[in-house]
C-alpha cells in the first residue's frame, strides 16, 4: 500500500505517525507526573524544580520534607524521551538526602557560581520552593499572633 503512494504522501504519513506518537507520549508523561506528585506529597511538603535543557540535559526534581525542612524523599525525572520516568535519588553533591535539612543544601547551592547554578537549577528551585513555603507559613503564623495580641 505505501509503495503506491507518492513520496510526499509517504512523508506526510510518517509525520502524522510521529505526531500521534508524540501526543500519546505526552499524555502518558503528564499522567506519570501527576501520579508522582500525589505519591511524593504523601511524604510531606513538596518543592518542585525544573531545569530546562536545550536538547538533552533538562530535569524535574521533586523534594518532600517535613515542616522543619528535613528531607523525607526525592525523585527526579531526567531523560531525553517521553519514555523517561521519575526515579528516587539518595544523594546530592555526595551527601545523603533523606534525613538531611534542605537548609544545609541551600547553604551550599547559594555559594555556587553561575555555571554551577545553571547545572543544578532543578535542584535549587525545588529547595527554594520549600524554603519559600516555610517562610510564608512563618509569616502567616506571626501575623496571626499579632492579630491575636491586638484583640486582647
Language-model regions, residue ranges each:
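Glycine-rich, charged/polar anion/phosphate-binding loops
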Residues: 46-50
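Transmembrane-cytosolic junction motif
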Residues: 24-44
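Cytosol-/stroma-facing membrane-proximal "stalk/adaptor" domains immediately downstream
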Residues: 103-152
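Intrinsically disordered, low-complexity acidic regions enriched in Pro/Ser/Thr
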Residues: 2, 36-43, 88, 93-96, ...
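Flexible, solvent-exposed short loops/turns enriched in glycine
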Residues: 70-113
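Single-pass alpha-helical transmembrane signal-anchor segments
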Residues: 10-27
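Short, strongly hydrophobic alpha-helical membrane anchors
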Residues: 1-9
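Acidic, Ser/Thr-rich low-complexity segments on the non-lumenal side of membrane proteins
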Residues: 51-83
Amino acid at each position: 500500500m505505501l509503495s503506491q503512494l507518492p513520496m510526499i504522501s509517504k512523508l506526510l504519513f510518517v509525520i502524522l505517525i510521529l505526531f500521534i506518537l508524540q501526543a500519546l507520549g505526552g499524555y502518558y508523561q503528564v499522567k506519570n507526573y501527576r501520579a508522582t506528585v500525589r505519591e511524593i506529597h504523601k511524604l510531606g511538603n513538596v518543592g518542585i524544580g525544573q531545569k530546562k535543557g536545550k536538547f538533552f540535559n533538562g530535569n524535574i526534581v521533586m523534594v518532600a520534607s517535613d515542616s522543619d525542612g528535613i528531607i523525607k524523599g526525592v525523585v527526579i525525572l531526567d531523560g531525553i524521551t517521553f519514555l523517561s520516568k521519575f526515579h528516587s535519588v539518595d544523594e546530592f553533591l555526595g551527601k545523603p538526602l533523606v534525613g538531611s535539612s534542605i537548609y544545609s543544601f541551600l547553604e551550599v547551592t547559594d555559594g555556587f557560581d553561575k555555571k554551577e547554578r545553571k547545572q543544578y537549577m532543578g535542584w535549587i528551585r525545588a529547595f527554594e520552593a520549600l524554603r519559600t513555603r516555610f517562610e510564608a507559613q512563618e509569616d502567616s503564623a506571626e501575623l496571626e499572633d499579632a492579630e491575636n495580641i491586638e484583640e486582647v
